[in-house]
Each structure stands twice: as structure tokens, then as C-alpha cells.
A protein has these predicted regions:
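A glycine-rich helix N-cap at a beta->alpha junction
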Residues: 176-186
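Substrate-binding/gating loop at the entrance of the active-site cleft, primarily
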Residues: 108-152, 157-167
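ALDH superfamily catalytic-core signature
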Residues: 8, 133-136, 140-151, 166, ...
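Single conserved hydrophobic/aromatic residue that forms the stacking wall/gate
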Residues: 314-333
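General beta-strand structural signal in soluble alpha/beta enzymes
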Residues: 104, 154-155, 186-189, 208-211, ...
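N-terminal Rossmann-like NAD(P)+-binding subdomain of aldehyde/semialdehyde dehydrogenases
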Residues: 1-116
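A structured beta-alpha segment of the ubiquitous adenosine-cofactor-binding alpha/beta core
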Residues: 112, 116-119, 186-204
């Protein structure tokens, strides 16, 4: 493990950046709801104004990644089309439409006369987020951080450095123009700094890593900062017997084909035994017409699925109280 990942001490440049984010996070944590919404709208505006520069940066990243022979799935995540960028910009604005997550009373009860117990939501402080080569994640993470009154230190995959830099510059411009401290969002672009983040317990309040099991486990074992670990996704969808059939079909299809390369694209479909005959009768031709291959267990094969799931992929057993009759895995043809 030590040969793959090492935890260096942070250099002066990283310490300075981290301190700037920490100070900015204190200010933004005290910012009124309307001012945070205003900041998000400005951030979206500047992403639009810098669309050309962002797409050009992404084109350069993509060319370099192709030359390195990066797998197609990663290339798909790296590619930022104008449509995907516009969707991300729209997402930033929609985050502003969410209810204010700050200062919400979750629990309030009188323990005894004059003694009130109250639990309220407050900003965490500074988030350290390590993620894969998916530039649209920069917009999503940054907008959620600002909306919730937090600062954020970002480290994306090196394959997307040019794109991430262009996006963060636009977001920082928006923050500045809205009257907030642009240092609330910081991007790291080298591997050494991403590992040195683990020694920034005086500056970072929570680390959120997205990557391999090995990376997530290493981070959890080599930092004193709280870690919200994420590695393997569940990627399951369950169709209940009381589900709206048409809605279930639409959700099942969209969750697979809308962005198949995404880490949260559906891989496994579980169908309640009572609705399975009707659901699969409509689902099978729908999936086939969209180039989705279904493989399933013995009982789903009886209902029309043609390809049997390998026992090396799934373990089929008869539960004490069976809820499902279908264990079907989605995979593209």
C-alpha cells in the first residue's frame, strides 16, 4: 500500500490555500440564505460566459487522455459536451432553488421546565473532496458546498485538470461578483497535494473520497480528519408491486441509458414477484429497443429474459420471505 500511496507533509503553498479556504468558509457560514442563492446564480452566469473556454479546455484534456489510452468508460466521463455543460449550469441554479439547509431545527423538546433541547443544522466548515475524472462533478460539488455554507477543496482526476481549472475559475469569478469570497472554492491539480490533504486536520473538517476501495480505505487509515467513504455503489433499482407501472418503466430505462458510464447507472434490477409478469412483458422489448441486454435468474428467464446471469456475478437463494422473483443485471450490448 505504501508503495502506491504516500502521505507527504503539506507544503507552504498548500497550507496557504487551505487557510484561505478556512477563512472563506467562516464568512460563508454566516452568509444569509438569499446571498448564497445570489452567489449560485452568479456562478451559473459565469459558467455560461466561459462556455467556450471550458469546452476548449475539455477538448485538450480529451485529446491527451486518448493519447494515453485511457479506457472508453473513463473517456466518456471525461467528455464534456455543450449539452452536458448546460445541464450542469442548470443544476447549479436548481441547487439555489432548494430549501435552505442551514439553521434548520431538527429536534426541539423541553427536557424539564426551562430546559430546552434543540438540534439545528449548521455548516460543516471545509470539505475536502477527491473524485474521478468527471468535470461536471466540479459544478455539482461546488454548488452544494456553497448552498450549505461550506468551503471546499477539490481534487479531481488529473486527466481533467484543464477542464476543472476552467470551471473553477468561472465559479470563483461568480463568487467574487456576488460579493462572496472566491477562496471558498479551491482546486488542487497534483497528486502530491491530494495526499497531503490528509494532514490538513487543522483546516479540513470532512474528507469525501470517491474512488477505488483501496484508495478510500487508505484515506480512512491515514488521516485524523473524519472521512465519508464512498467506494462501491449499490446501483440497484427495486420495482415494488404497488409501483406505477409506466413510471417504473421510465425510471428503469432512464437510470441505465441516460448516462451508462456514470458510476451510479443502474446495474441490477429487482422486481417484486407480484408485478414481475406484467412489468417484464413491457420492459423486455423496451430495453431491447434501446440496446440494453438483460440477464437474469431462473425465475426471470421463465418470464422472457433470454440470457442467464452467471453465478459468479450473483448468488441466488430462496429467502425465508421472498420478495422478488427477478434478479436482472443491466449491461450494454
Amino acid at each position: 500500500m505504501a508503495n502506491i500511496f504516500e502521505v507527504p507533509q503539506p507544503g507552504n503553498d498548500l497550507l496557504e490555500k487551505a487557510d484561505q479556504v478556512r477563512l472563506a468558509s467562516i464568512k460563508i457560514s454566516q452568509t444569509e440564505n438569499q446571498n448564497r442563492i445570489k452567489a449560485l446564480n452568479f456562478m451559473a452566469d459565469y459558467l455560461e460566459k466561459n462556455t467556450k473556454e471550458i469546452l476548449e479546455a475539455n477538448s485538450e484534456d480529451y485529446k491527451r487522455a486518448e493519447k494515453k489510452g485511457i479506457p472508453k468508460a473513463l473517456l466518456s466521463r471525461l467528455k464534456l459536451s455543450k449539452e452536458k455543460l448546460n445541464s450542469g449550469i442548470d443544476g447549479v441554479r436548481k441547487v439555489g432553488d432548494l430549501a435552505d439547509p442551514v439553521d434548520q431545527v431538527q429536534i426541539k423538546r423541553e427536557l424539564s421546565k426551562g430546559l430546552i433541547l434543540e438540534r439545528k443544522t449548521v455548516p460543516i466548515g471545509v470539505l475536502g473532496v477527491i473524485f474521478e475524472s468527471r468535470p461536471d462533478a466540479v459544478m455539482q460539488i461546488s454548488s452544494l458546498a456553497i448552498r450549505s455554507g461550506n468551503g471546499v477543496i477539490l481534487k479531481g482526476g488529473s486527466e481533467a485538470n484543464y477542464t476543472n481549472t476552467a470551471i473553477v475559475e468561472a465559479l470563483q469569478q461568480g463568487l467574487h461578483e456576488s460579493g462572496l469570497d472566491k477562496n471558498a472554492i479551491c482546486l488542487l491539480t497534483n497528486r502530491k497535494d491530494s495526499m497531503a490533504m490528509l494532514n490538513l486536520e487543522k483546516y479540513i473538517n470532512l474528507i469525501i473520497p470517491r474512488g477505488s476501495n483501496e484508495l478510500v480505505k487508505f484515506i480512512q487509515e491515514n488521516t485524523r480528519i473524519p472521512v465519508l467513504g464512498h467506494a462501491d455503489g449499490i446501483c440497484h433499482l427495486f420495482i415494488d408491486n404497488e409501483a406505477d407501472l409506466e413510471m417504473a418503466l421510465a425510471v428503469a430505462l432512464d437510470s441505465k441509458i441516460q448516462y451508462p458510464a456514470a458510476c451510479n447507472a443502474i446495474e441490477t434490477l429487482l422486481v417484486h414477484r407480484d408485478i414481475a409478469p406484467v412489468f417484464l412483458k413491457k420492459a423486455i422489448p423496451l430495453f431491447n429497443s434501446n440496446d440494453v441486454k438483460l440477464i437474469g435468474d431462473e425465475r426471470s428467464l421463465e418470464l422472457g429474459i433470454k440470457h442467464e446471469a452467471s453465478l459468479s456475478l450473483i448468488h441466488i437463494s430462496e429467502p425465508t420471505r421472498p420478495l422478488y422473483i427477478s434478479y436482472a443485471v443491466f449491461c450494454l450490448k
